[in-house]
Regions:
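Small-residue-rich helix-loop
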Residues: 105-117
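N-terminal glycine-rich phosphate-binding loop for ADP-containing cofactors
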Residues: 2, 27, 40-41, 61-65, ...
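A general structural signal for well-ordered alpha-helical segments in protein cores
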Residues: 10, 52, 59, 78-81, ...
């Protein structure tokens, strides 16, 4: 199951299927549609290690790396974790480039400097040039990302985390 969803649902699916002697893996994907087509996505897999081992050949065809994270639901949990970093990296890059332009700096030059500095993130490679050229078209539906951010915040709240940056991110998306 490559759906980005609630880890509890993945646990429920797994329990239901396991009771019928069917293995279930929540194999969430980190990467854009283009990265998936090019085999550059990363898979984060929850479920039994035996089932993961049986499916590694399939995973190697879908992405450049696959990680067995743990039991059922852990792939879904890891996807939420990576989506926090991804969403906030994109927002931070956009804000940094806007600041560069507002301060009279060339955004393309600022991007080059940030790519060479400790501020570097792979988001700069996938979104930086697009942002500099004014192309802000999303790679995915914003409503889908907002759903993920709300799910992230629900799990953060459940764990007792304030998550102020993710709350702001949600407000921007709304």
């Amino acid at each position: 199951d490559t759906t980005t969803g609630d880890p509890a649902a993945a646990e429920d699916f797994s329990a239901n299927l396991t009771s019928r002697d069917i293995e279930y893996l929540d194999a969430t994907i980190s990467g854009s549609s283009a990265q998936v087509r090019q085999g550059e996505a990363v898979l984060m897999v929850g479920g039994s290690s035996v089932a993961f081992s049986r499916c590694e050949d399939i995973f190697s065809r879908l992405g450049s790396a696959s990680f067995h994270i743990g039991g059922p639901g852990s792939g879904a949990r890891m996807k939420l974790v990576t989506n926090v970093a991804l969403g906030l990296n994109r927002a931070a890059l956009g804000e940094a480039l806007a600041l560069a332009a507002a301060m009279g700096l060339d955004p393309a030059r600022a991007l080059a400097v940030m790519r060479a500095s400790v501020a570097y993130s792979r988001v700069m490679d996938s979104k930086g040039d697009k942002m500099v050229s004014g192309n802000f078209a999303p790679d995915a539906r914003l409503s889908q990302h907002l759903k993920d951010v709300r799910l992230i915040l629900a799990h953060g709240h459940e764990a007792g985390l304030a998550m102020p940056f993710s709350n702001t991110h949600r407000e921007v998306l709304e």
